[in-house]
A protein has these predicted regions:
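Interaction-mediating elements
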Residues: 1-133
């Protein structure tokens, strides 16, 4: 399951935050096939003045609105799956009024042994060991 950190500006109403998180989750289900009940989400709010970006980097004309920053920690995925996730997120979030030019996504791959979902246990390694019998 990926760990997704959603960084947004202060002041978004709770219903909008909830809708945003559900839309992002639906994108992961669609692009990566994660379970409907999967995924872990952390939502951080920051002050607009705390984000400083190059508004024209890579020839992308960003608006004066603060970007939506997504940080994804996940087991390794293929280049094709990453590209598909980027495309689906941009497409679906644009429907909510988030300009694709203002969407910043970073994926940090991890290995199975890098995860514990509680109890101080590496569940993914146990799952791997159990499937080898």
């Amino acid at each position: 399951m990926p760990l997704i950190t959603i960084n947004i500006t202060e002041g978004m109403i709770e219903e909008s935050i909830d809708h945003l998180q559900k839309t992002i989750h639906a994108c992961f289900v669609r692009a990566w096939g994660i379970p409907e009940n999967g995924g872990f989400y952390v939502i951080n709010e920051y002050k607009k003045s705390r984000v400083r970006i190059n508004r024209n980097m890579w020839g992308i004309q960003r608006s004066d609105q603060p970007p939506l920053l997504l940080q994804i920690t996940s087991s390794p995925r293929s280049k094709e799956l990453k590209i598909e996730l980027f495309r689906v997120l941009a497409e679906e979030l644009e429907k909510q009024g988030i300009r694709k030019e203002d969407l910043f996504i970073s994926i940090s791959p991890t290995q199975r042994e890098d995860w514990s979902f509680g109890n101080g246990v590496a569940q993914l390694l146990q799952e791997e060991a159990n499937s080898s019998f």
